[in-house]
Regions:
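Acidic, proline/glycine-rich low-complexity IDRs
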Residues: 135, 368-404
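Long, low-complexity regulatory segments enriched in Ser/Thr/Pro/Gly and acidic residues
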Residues: 246-255, 266
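Short inter-helical turns and helix N-cap capping residues of alpha-solenoid HEAT/ARM repeat scaffolds
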Residues: 36-38, 68-71, 99-102, 132-133, ...
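Extended, charge-biased low-complexity segments
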Residues: 261-371
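Amphipathic alpha-helical scaffolding segments comprising HEAT/armadillo-like alpha-solenoid repeats
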Residues: 2-5, 21-33, 54-66, 84-97, ...
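Extended alpha-helical scaffolding segments
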Residues: 220-250
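Structural detector for internal amphipathic alpha-helices that build alpha-solenoid repeat scaffolds
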Residues: 6-22, 40-54, 63, 73-85, ...
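Short, extreme N-terminal segment that most often corresponds to the first beta-strand
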Residues: 2-11, 282-286, 399-404
Length: 404
């Protein structure tokens, strides 16, 4: 039985990619431009056309790209397919493109401008390449790489200047890929730029030399962190940390027990703009004593049972929320569906209602109750991803963290 496009792509998520790549290019182009077809089939056809677009179909495919009423997924796929067509450039550069609110279209337009050699897009591409979302960042980087390949990285950097952090971040990346040393960028005042620079560094001896004369405390800490990443030398890192005076971010109200639990859970893996003092503290300080989560839950259950609160079996926060994961377990109790939360990061417990009976029972069993006053302390300069945000969080959210 002869294959058809419909049989090769019968429904969303079920596409014979290799079969479409071997299919007649003219038929694929016709399907990709056919608004009567499902968008996912049209996109699959566009993707299967890579490197073999029939010239006679190009005007119709371009018309689909330029149709703001068409499905953005299809437009983006077609734009990627035809990103080498210079006749698209005037449309791509038109100010109206900035008003196109279709999801992903603005990024795709910028990427195409980079692919077509539009040096005036360098600034917007640098902004995109500085975005915390990986797919946007990669689009920006690909566009900048295309410009650098065409004009040389010096021309791209000259177009950008260095006033904005995103321009300097692009400079770090392009200079590194051109074989230049970017150790000097560890002293950049923007932590995201300095963080990117340390990721690129691979010469431990050069870092040791830089560390001795780094111009700022943060530059020294970035150098120390990069050196630790390269050598995994915990003892040496701790020795240098002591020599620097054990610098750390002071947070009013954050005691040592809370601090240790938080820094050792989040410090090394925090977001780019996190103060490097948190990262180094996570490496150089002792973690909280090891504990058995199962034993802790058993102790909580026993305390709640002894208090006559009729606790139900504990579940993970992911199970309680029916998705995701995090740093606490949930114990339901009583007839009204009340819940108490037991952190996996230490002996911390809390609930939404500050139930005095629950608090009394758990405190008598050695737990530490996190009330509103303590829970609301914001841990400054420690960026942790949380439902799209990367800003510092409060103690309650960090100890009882859940992400879907």
């Amino acid at each position: 039985m002869a294959k058809t496009i419909k049989k090769l792509s019968p429904e969303a998520g079920r596409t014979d990619t290799e079969g479409l790549r071997a299919f007649d290019a003219d038929a694929l182009a016709k399907c990709a431009a056919d608004a009567a077809q499902p968008w996912w089939r049209r996109r699959a056809c566009a993707q299967a056309l890579a490197g073999r677009v029939p010239e006679r179909r190009v005007p119709r495919l371009i018309a689909c790209i330029q149709d703001a009423g068409d499905v953005s997924e299809v437009r983006i796929a077609l734009l990627g397919l035809l990103a080498d067509r210079p006749e698209l450039l005037p449309w791509l550069r038109h100010e109206d493109r900035q008003q196109d609110g279709a999801y992903g279209m603005a990024e795709a337009v910028l990427g195409a401008r980079g692919a077509l050699g539009d040096l005036t897009a360098a600034g917007a591409l640098a902004t995109l390449a500085f975005n915390p979302w990986r797919h946007r960042r990669e689009t920006g980087e690909e566009g900048l790489d295309a410009l650098a390949a065409r004009y040389g990285f010096e021309a791209v950097l000259a177009e950008l200047g260095g006033a904005r952090p995103e321009d300097r971040s692009t400079g770090v990346r392009l200079r590194h890929h051109a074989g230049e040393d970017v150790t000097d960028a560890l002293a950049d005042p923007d932590r995201a730029v300095a963080h990117r620079a340390q990721e690129f560094l691979t010469d431990a001896e050069r870092l040791r030399g830089y560390l001795a004369g780094a111009p700022t405390e943060e530059a020294k800490l970035w150098a120390l962190y990069a050196l630790y990443r390269l050598t995994d030398d915990t003892a040496g890192t701790r020795r240098r940390y002591e020599e620097l005076g054990r610098p750390r971010v002071e947070v009013a109200g954050l005691d040592e027990e809370l601090r240790a639990a938080i820094v050792h859970e989040y410090g090394q893996w925090a977001e780019e703009r996190t103060d490097p003092r948190w990262r180094i503290e996570a490496v150089c300080t002792q973690p909280p004593p090891a504990c058995d989560p199962a034993e802790r839950l058993q102790r909580a259950m026993a305390a709640l049972t002894a208090a006559g609160l009729a606790p139900r079996p504990p579940v993970s926060c992911g199970e309680d929320n029916r998705q995701g994961d995090g740093t606490y377990h949930v114990i339901g109790y009583g007839p009204s569906g009340s819940k108490v939360f037991i952190s996996t990061l230490g002996r911390f417990a809390t609930d939404h209602d500050d139930d005095p009976d629950v608090r009394r029972a758990l405190e008598s069993a050695g737990f530490r109750w996190i009330d509103q006053a303590v829970g609301s302390i914001r841990v400054t300069d420690l960026g942790v991803y949380y439902f799209g945000s990367r800003d510092p969080l409060d103690v309650h959210t960090l100890l009882f963290y859940w992400q879907d």
